[in-house]
């Protein structure tokens, strides 16, 4: 039986390397590559054609869901597993829409990730317990349950990304630098987020991000 070929995508070198060591110690896995952001992950996936891509959600540069969608469009058989500390409904919905096969909380042990990789490589799906109760399956496809859809609001992936930073005490200029965007663009994103959520100041915006777990992504 051939080993399952894995590509790891995470902007934290320690996380990437630790996962690579732990997974490589299991005879059924072969970590064929690592990437530090979604854009590099996309290029590596096309070049290496892994069986499974394990991708962090919170990374600078290209939005992970955009990269994953492009990977799926080019490599239909590749399975995507997302890792994140944030279990915000919008993230879950975005992952399901692009056809992710798994979504795990980063706090879970490596063995849970190993189980997820085995399951998705065999054609199944794997979701953390906290997520299973918020999704429904119909004819082999998964989506957010209606109650969760109501909570996910209408925020875009970029707006969700912007929303994480005010609670960390960062200025718009600092956020712009991290996201490689102009301060004016960040200001526009913040204004749209506040309008959609009916929030009227940055303090309230930060509280919302903390309550939704977005600062832990």
What is each of the regions a protein language model found here?
Residues 43, 65-77:
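Short amphipathic alpha-helix used as the core "switch/output" element in two-component signaling
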Residues 90-157, 161, 203, 214-215:
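Short, flexible helix-to-coil linker/hinge segments that flank and couple to helix-turn-helix
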